[in-house]
């Protein structure tokens, strides 16, 4: 066995021999296989809704996400113009005239309903739809649940990845966020919740504008980590059905992120992910978990240590899936993204309270005639 391992390492390291026969890489069968793979590859769409969602989309386009179509949706024409995406949709052209939703989720909701046909066309053929937004404002809070409802009715596995506002942003945004979260829970398979306040525990001295950037980065890593386990060749890949099994009807999900480059990097990274302030819930009753392991030289033994540690914290009946992605930029570091689904969530509000969230400040959707201004 040792010799077999040594031979495998030697073949990997050795330079190709000049006398080796040339291999045809563009044969007819290769082309047929490529076409077949294109047909059976899961179609994954990532939709950023509202200002925060579109900021996340910009970051995704910057870092790159393999095998996903990126769509930006907003009621603010000026903000939408600045976004890089494969497709853009200005929501509620007649209702808002591109001026935004004014922090009113009701306007965001009506704007998305006005643009339902465009949304349906943009999501046509999707197997999985990620919806990213920051809850608390008008467009993301109001429109994201409408987009989610459309995607789910079209048969796509629908996963929202959302941030909750910092406490310092005020009670109105917090109440708006609670309203939006309840509606998303009804219209998605899984909602991954990232409470911004928890970032203060990770980096308490972070300036507020940088804290928002960190929140964007966590959203990006969550979506990218899950997507590329399906779409990007790696040491251990998942297929779409694996992910569907864990995320379908997954309810509220939380994430933990850990990384380490020490001698015991695998265990330390796993422990960090499990103890992450972002994962500040009891996971013992969770329905499932997805573990994404990244590194330039992850060993099989290290992967085993990570899986065993995580599964030891979960219900024995929980469904756990995992994959390994090669990332040369991490050097000697191992990074773990842990997504735990079906957790008991503190982010629930009574259904009968929903209509009172906007109070006296609520504004009804209006049409603006700019020619009269």
From Swiss-Prot:
Residues that hold GTP according to the record: 51-55, 138-140, 169, 173, 216
GO cellular component assignments: cell division site; cytoplasm
Gene3D superfamilies attached to this UniProt entry: Tubulin/FtsZ, C-terminal domain, Tubulin/FtsZ, GTPase domain
Gene Ontology MF term list: GTP binding; GTPase activity
Chief place of localization: cytoplasm
Region spans: Disordered: 354-373
SMART domains: Tubulin, Tubulin_C
InterPro entries membership: Cell_div_FtsZ, Cell_div_FtsZ_CS, FtsZ/CetZ, FtsZ_C, Tub_FtsZ_C, Tubulin/FtsZ-like_C, Tubulin/FtsZ_2-layer-sand-dom, Tubulin/FtsZ_GTPase_sf
Record-linked PROSITE patterns: FTSZ_1, FTSZ_2
Taxonomy, superkingdom: Archaea
One Pfam family of this chain: Tubulin
Function: Essential cell division protein that forms a contractile ring structure (Z ring) at the future cell division site. The regulation of the ring assembly controls the timing and the location of cell division. One of the functions of the FtsZ ring is to recruit other cell division proteins to the septum to produce a new cell wall between the dividing cells. Binds GTP and shows GTPase activity.
PANTHER family reported for this sequence: CELL DIVISION PROTEIN FTSZ-RELATED, MITOCHONDRIAL DIVISION PROTEIN FSZA
Record protein name field: Cell division protein FtsZ 1
């Amino acid at each position: 066995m040792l010799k077999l391992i040594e031979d495998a390492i030697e073949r990997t390291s050795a330079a190709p021999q000049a006398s080796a026969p040339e291999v045809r890489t563009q044969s007819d069968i290769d082309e047929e296989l490529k076409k077949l793979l294109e047909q059976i590859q899961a179609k994954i769409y990532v939709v950023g809704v509202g200002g925060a969602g579109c900021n996340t989309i910009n970051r995704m386009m910057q870092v790159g996400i393999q095998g996903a179509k990126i769509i930006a949706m907003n009621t603010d024409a000026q903000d939408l113009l600045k976004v890089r995406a494969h497709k853009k949709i200005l929501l509620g052209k007649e209702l808002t005239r591109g001026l935004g939703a004014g922090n009113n989720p009701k306007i965001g909701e009506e704007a998305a309903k006005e643009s339902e046909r465009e949304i349906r066309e943009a999501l046509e053929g999707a197997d999985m739809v990620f919806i990213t937004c920051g809850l608390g404002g008008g467009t993301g809070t109001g429109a994201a649940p409408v987009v989610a409802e459309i995607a789910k009715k079209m048969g796509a596995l629908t996963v929202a990845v959302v941030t909750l506002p910092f406490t310092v942003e005020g009670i109105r945004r917090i109440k708006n966020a609670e309203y939006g979260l309840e509606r998303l829970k009804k219209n998605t398979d899984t909602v991954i919740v990232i409470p911004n306040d928890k970032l203060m525990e990770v980096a308490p001295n972070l300036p507020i504008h940088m804290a928002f950037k960190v929140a964007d980065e966590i959203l990006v890593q969550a979506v990218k980590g899950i997507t590329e386990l399906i779409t990007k060749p790696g040491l251990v890949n998942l297929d779409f059905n694996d992910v569907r099994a864990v995320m379908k009807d997954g309810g509220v999900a939380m994430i933990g992120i850990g990384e380490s480059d020490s001698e015991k990097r695998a265990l330390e990274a796993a422990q960090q992910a499990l103890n992450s302030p972002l994962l500040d819930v009891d996971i013992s009753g969770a329905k499932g978990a997805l573990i994404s392991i990244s590194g330039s030289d992850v060993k099989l033994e290290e992967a085993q240590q990570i899986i065993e540690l995580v599964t030891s914290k979960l219900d024995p009946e929980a469904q756990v899936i995992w994959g390994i992605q090669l990332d040369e930029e991490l050097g000697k570091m191992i990074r773990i993204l842990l997504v735990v689904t079906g957790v008991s969530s503190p982010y629930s509000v009574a259904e009968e309270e929903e209509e009172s969230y906007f109070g006296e400040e609520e504004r009804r959707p209006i049409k603006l005639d700019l020619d009269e201004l």
